[in-house]
Regions:
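Catalytic metal-binding/acid-base residues of hydrolase active sites
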Residues: 35, 96, 181, 219-222, ...
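Bacterial Sec-dependent N-terminal signal peptides
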Residues: 1-24
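N-terminal, active-site-proximal structural segment of metallo-dependent hydrolase catalytic domains
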Residues: 19-110, 118-126, 195, 302-307, ...
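Structured beta-strand-rich core segments of catalytic domains in phosphoester-bond hydrolases
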Residues: 89, 95-172, 180
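Metal-dependent phosphoester-hydrolase catalytic domains
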Residues: 20-21, 202-213, 221-335
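Short, solvent-exposed loop/turn elements at domain surfaces
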Residues: 36-43, 101, 184-185, 282-284, ...
Length: 335
């Protein structure tokens, strides 16, 4: 009888040990500007004519399928060398509609993801969306908040702010996905967008005490620019006050010289993910661990005039069968 008891206890200890070994303590979230993920069909009321078969890019089914495959290759690789499950959610920009997202998630490597998307007001028809793994991130609510124009400027109106709230690792987490106006608009237009996001963040943090809030997107500004300071995104953790954010990308760009897009030989880091103060705790709960610009050789042009730049879908009007003019960014969270 004693022998059976000890055998049972030994087996039980093995099961417990195995469970402890497989317990997750690291999660990831990411952002990626997909650069013009258009299908080949005209959307009524949208200026998508360049991306039609008879448009300036001669956009056809072959090119569209190649684009989907390329995007899936990148998205399904994000953080996998660190977190086996991949990102719990991925904010994306420059997607035309729900149709392209449906097609993207039909790619075998992306089939475990779902998406949240609302049709926005952008005249070209490009929107933000959130891809999420329901096994990791349980969505509770979502909405798109439309942007108010800056001094009546509807030409440079931003795409709206996608807000999704849910549970990650058993904790309430909220994410705001952004795509702020391009550099074709002057700085005050992006400062205006930042002011609106800060107001949304303040409202959310007032409603949910100690909310773990993530703001991500293509801000079309660098971490040290005025718009990001208006948002309250700080370089050092010790500087972050209640209601503000930690911005790890400031150090990435300024101190390490690493960015997400190259313009005239200079790196910018427009694709940022910033974290509210409750995600900075040192010991308890879900908290910031480290960040990464996802830089792989296949994402970079290896020769020619634009050697060293992210390998785009097009160079001018020439189809390069590349990926995007931006590189993805990843945040790792420890539990």
């Amino acid at each position: 009888m004693k022998r059976l008891f000890f055998l049972w206890m030994f087996a039980f200890c093995l099961v417990v040990a195995e469970a402890q070994n497989t317990k997750r303590d690291l999660y990831s979230v990411a952002f990626y500007n997909l650069e013009n993920l258009f299908d080949t069909i005209h959307d009524e009321g949208k200026n998508d004519y360049d991306f039609l078969p008879d448009g300036s890019y001669k956009w056809n089914s072959k090119k569209y399928e190649a684009k989907l495959e390329n995007m899936a290759k990148v998205l399904s690789s994000l953080s996998r060398d660190v977190v086996e499950e991949g990102p719990a959610f991925i904010g994306v920009a420059e997607v035309e509609n729900s149709r392209v997202l449906t097609d993207l998630l039909k790619q075998p490597s992306m089939s475990h993801y779902k998406f949240i998307h609302y049709e926005g007001p952008d005249k070209r028809g490009i929107d933000c969306a959130l891809l999420y793994d329901p096994q990791q991130f349980e969505v509770n609510t979502s909405k798109l908040v439309l942007s108010e124009p800056y001094q009546g400027d509807t030409v440079h109106l931003t795409r709206g702010f996608l807000i999704v709230e849910g549970k990650l690792a058993g904790e309430r987490v909220c994410v705001i996905v952004n795509h702020w106006p391009s550099r074709g608009a002057k700085s005050p237009v992006r400062v205006h967008a930042a002011r609106q996001v800060r107001a949304l963040a303040d409202s959310l943090q007032h409603e949910y005490r100690k909310l773990k809030l993530i703001v991500m997107g293509d801000m079309n500004d660098d971490p040290m620019d005025e718009s990001m300071q208006t948002l309250g995104a700080r370089k050092y953790k010790k500087e972050v006050k209640k209601g503000e954010f930690y911005n790890p990308w400031w150090e990435t760009l300024e101190d390490k010289g690493v960015g997400t897009l190259l313009y005239r030989g200079k790196w910018n880091l427009f694709d940022q993910i910033v974290l509210s103060k409750p995600l900075l705790k040192k010991r308890r709960g879900l908290r910031f661990d480290h960040s990464e610009v996802f830089l792989r050789d296949y994402l970079i042009q290896q020769d020619g005039k634009y050697k060293g730049s992210p390998l785009r879908t097009h160079g001018g009007r020439t189809w390069l069968n590349g990926y995007s003019d931006h590189l993805p960014t990843i945040i790792y969270l420890r539990k």
